[in-house]
């Protein structure tokens, strides 16, 4: 029964407190802590004895003595004439709505401001007593039936500026907003949709958050709860919210709020079932390129993937699977490679790449494709040192270990040869051997290369071309790859014992090949093989029964002039000549025959000159001299011409010391014997080419040299005899021999001979 009079009791307490406070204008109001006070009402005092008595009678009937309540008498006097505590109790008993009481109290009438009405506090207290759950909401609902939203907003805003009414007005204003605006409208009303990255630092955000809390507290909104992140997403979209969070994180003041918002955003996405694939695009990570793993958003996204898998186990995925799905192996692979080179992202890249390789292995991805995805097809300079190459090699090994690949083994060298020329691979091997970090891999690659050539059926001449030796010319021996090739030949001929010269013979003409082998003999690493190959070359010629003269020309010895006898090719040819004569004794060929048929006079002369000057060529010199003499005799070459051919006419004072003088002397003797009617003397030839005066000087000098003294003396005697026969007077000779002691002596000798012959 006491409940029926609660409103009156509250009114009594309310006004009793007002009186007890004497002149105080503030009375306590039930409400949240944020709104602790509401202004007292100013009323016209009057008498309401009847109302008081009526109430008294009713209270007595119900066992409640209102008069016994402190201050009741004075409270009753505060009501207007019509609005006594009696009617208030009656309204309460009949459960009249706050709107009904509002009209009865005529608060919307009069000249006073709403909050200054004499019965405003009575109505507030009545509403608070009647509506226990949310009295402010009930007040606003009642007020909205009597005022437009604009007018009501102005009234509330005006009341907020008055200290005695600001508390309640603020609370009611919030209720008014909740009643009149949707969360989105309120967000726009506060212009928070225009702030963008600075929204978390905007003072008005706290107003909206209080609004949001009040809005969410309403039972009617239980199923449509609003959050800050949902509202930000509505107005700024996902990417805009991300920008807001990232900007706020950089400011110490807003960093905590940003981190909290970030967590709420994750939960918001999870609640809405946003997949990692969708979020990857939202975060623009699909366009991050090589900066993907370094992006703070990537770490954020990675955490989201974990949370997503927890909440949606049936749709669980991995970071790598999503990246491959969104970017494709073609794009993500180079990103991981680049990230692996940066210390800050190296570990993350290695982890993701390990997942990628597992995926490839599970899918039986073609190693050749993986090779290209890893950009190994364009890494010749540092392939063996590349971490990616090692990973790829391990992948091939793991793939080959799978049972389904027992009959489909993948060859590393086959893939390498498809992407790089053998010459490039060879250079990789050589370079790799020099570095400790790659030497093991280089040796392994070298063995694989040999095996690959043999397995592919590559012949020596094929490998010769693969290594580009067919374009190296005579410099092939200088190629760093030469040792690699010779080693291959050793491997090859162990498996296929065929003539070793086939490859070289197809790649080079006879002379070039011979030069090649001779050069190879001088290189320690290929000396032994070169000797074998040279033997093989000679054997090849013998098998073909090539004439020595043909080989002589094939080796271009007939074009070497002065260099024939000093050329290593000449030794090769002489070896072949000996082997030919042994194998075909009935068809023996002499060296002189070859010289005779292969060399012209000029070349033979040069050859003869060279042979005369080389100590170890005495026998050959004799043979060459014979050939030369026979050729001159056959053509009836005059001794004078032969003298000139041998360039003795240009020897000047050194003519008697020239080895070729002996050759010419031998020819002169043979010529005179064969053609006695055309006999030529040595002295006549000397006189013809040098003249008497110059000849005398030459002979005089030669007589002082032991090796030429004899021939010089003989020629001098012949010259004197020629003068005697020509009746050259001593006086004329005196002009030639000079006045020195040697000249005087020679003149005396001549005069004696002259006198003996002519007696004058």
Curated annotation (Swiss-Prot):
Q: Where is this region: 7 X 93 AA tandem repeats?
A: 87-760
The alphabetized UniProt keywords are:
Repeat, Secreted, Signal, Virulence
Q: Which cysteines are joined by disulfide bonds?
A: none
One of this protein's Pfam families, by short name?
PexRD54_WY
What coarse category fits the chief subcellular location reported for this protein? secreted
Domain comment from the record reads as follows: The RxLR-dEER motif acts to carry the protein into the host cell cytoplasm through binding to cell surface phosphatidylinositol-3-phosphate.
The protein's name: RxLR effector protein PSR2
Name the source organism.
Answer: Phytophthora infestans (strain T30-4)
Traced from the root, the source organism's taxonomic lineage reads: Eukaryota, Sar, Stramenopiles, Oomycota, Peronosporales
């Amino acid at each position: 029964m006491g409940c029926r009079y609660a409103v009156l009791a509250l009114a009594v307490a309310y006004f009793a407190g007002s009186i007890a406070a004497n002149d105080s204008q503030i009375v306590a109001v039930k409400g949240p802590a944020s709104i602790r006070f509401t202004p007292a009402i100013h009323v016209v005092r009057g008498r309401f004895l009847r109302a008081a008595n009526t109430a008294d009678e009713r209270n007595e009937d119900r066992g409640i003595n209102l008069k016994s309540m402190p201050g009741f008498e004075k409270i009753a006097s505060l009501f207007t004439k019509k609005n006594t505590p009696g009617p208030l109790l009656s309204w309460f008993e009949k459960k009249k709505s706050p709107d009904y009481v509002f009209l009865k109290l005529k608060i919307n009438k009069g000249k006073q401001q709403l909050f200054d009405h004499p019965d405003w506090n009575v109505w507030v207290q009545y509403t608070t007593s009647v509506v226990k759950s949310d009295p402010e909401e009930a007040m606003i609902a009642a007020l909205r039936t009597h005022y437009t939203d604009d007018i009501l907003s102005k009234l509330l805003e005006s009341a907020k500026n008055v200290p005695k009414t600001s508390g309640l007005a603020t609370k009611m204003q919030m209720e008014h907003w909740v009643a009149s605006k949707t969360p989105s409208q309120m967000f726009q009303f506060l212009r928070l949709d225009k702030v963008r990255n600075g929204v978390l630092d905007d003072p008005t955000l706290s107003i909206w958050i209080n609004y949001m809390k009040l809005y969410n507290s309403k039972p009617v909104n239980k199923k449509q709860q609003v959050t800050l992140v949902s509202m930000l997403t509505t107005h700024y979209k996902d990417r805009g919210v991300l920008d807001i969070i990232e900007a706020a994180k950089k400011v110490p003041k807003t960093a905590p709020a940003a981190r909290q918002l970030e967590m709420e955003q994750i939960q918001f996405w999870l609640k809405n079932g946003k997949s990692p694939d969708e979020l990857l695009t939202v975060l623009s990570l699909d366009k991050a390129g090589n900066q993907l793993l370094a992006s703070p958003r990537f770490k954020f996204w990675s955490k989201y993937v974990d949370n997503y898998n927890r909440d949606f186990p049936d749709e669980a995925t991995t970071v790598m699977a999503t990246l491959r799905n969104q970017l494709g192996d073609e794009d993500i692979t180079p990103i991981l490679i680049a990230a692996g080179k940066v210390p800050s992202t190296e570990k993350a890249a290695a982890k993701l790449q390990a997942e990628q390789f597992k995926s490839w292995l599970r899918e039986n991805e073609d190693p050749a494709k993986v090779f290209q995805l890893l950009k190994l097809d364009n890494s010749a300079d540092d392939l063996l040192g590349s971490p990616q190459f090692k990973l790829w090699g391990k992948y091939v090994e793991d793939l080959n270990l799978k049972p389904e690949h027992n009959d489909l083994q993948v060859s590393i060298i086959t893939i390498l040869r498809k992407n790089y020329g053998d010459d490039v691979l060879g250079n990789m091997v050589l370079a790799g051997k020099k570095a400790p970090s790659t030497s093991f891999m280089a040796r392994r690659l070298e063995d694989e290369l040999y095996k690959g050539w043999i397995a592919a059926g590559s012949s020596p001449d094929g490998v010769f071309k693969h290594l580009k030796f067919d374009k190296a010319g005579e410099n092939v021996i200088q190629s760093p790859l030469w040792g690699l090739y010779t080693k291959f030949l050793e491997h090859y001929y162990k498996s296929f014992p065929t003539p070793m010269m086939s490859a070289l013979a197809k790649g080079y003409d006879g002379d070039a090949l011979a030069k090649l082998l001779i050069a190879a003999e001088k290189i320690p690493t290929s000396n032994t093989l070169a000797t074998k190959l040279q033997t093989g070359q000679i054997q090849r010629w013998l098998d073909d029964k090539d004439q020595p003269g043909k080989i002589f020309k094939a080796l271009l010895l007939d074009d070497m002039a002065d260099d024939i006898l000093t050329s290593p090719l000449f030794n090769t040819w002489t070896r072949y000549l000996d082997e030919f004569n042994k194998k075909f004794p009935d068809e023996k060929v002499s060296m002189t025959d070859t010289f005779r048929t292969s060399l012209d006079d000029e070349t033979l002369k040069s050859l003869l000159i060279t042979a005369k000057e080389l100590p170890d060529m005495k026998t050959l010199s004799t043979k060459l001299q014979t050939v030369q003499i026979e050729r001159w005799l056959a053509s009836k070459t005059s001794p004078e011409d032969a003298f000139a051919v041998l360039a003795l006419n240009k020897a000047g004072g050194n003519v008697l010391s020239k080895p070729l003088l002996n050759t010419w002397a031998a020819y002169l003797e043979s010529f005179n014997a064969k053609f006695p009617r055309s006999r030529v003397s040595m002295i006549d030839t000397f006189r013809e080419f040098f003249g008497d005066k110059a000849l005398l000087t030459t002979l005089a000098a030669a007589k002082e040299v032991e090796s030429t003294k004899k021939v010089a003396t003989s020629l001098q005697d012949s010259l004197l005899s020629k003068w005697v026969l020509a009746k050259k007077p001593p006086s004329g000779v005196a002009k030639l021999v000079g006045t020195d002691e040697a000249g005087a002596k020679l003149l005396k000798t001549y005069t004696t001979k002259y006198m003996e012959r002519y007696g004058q």
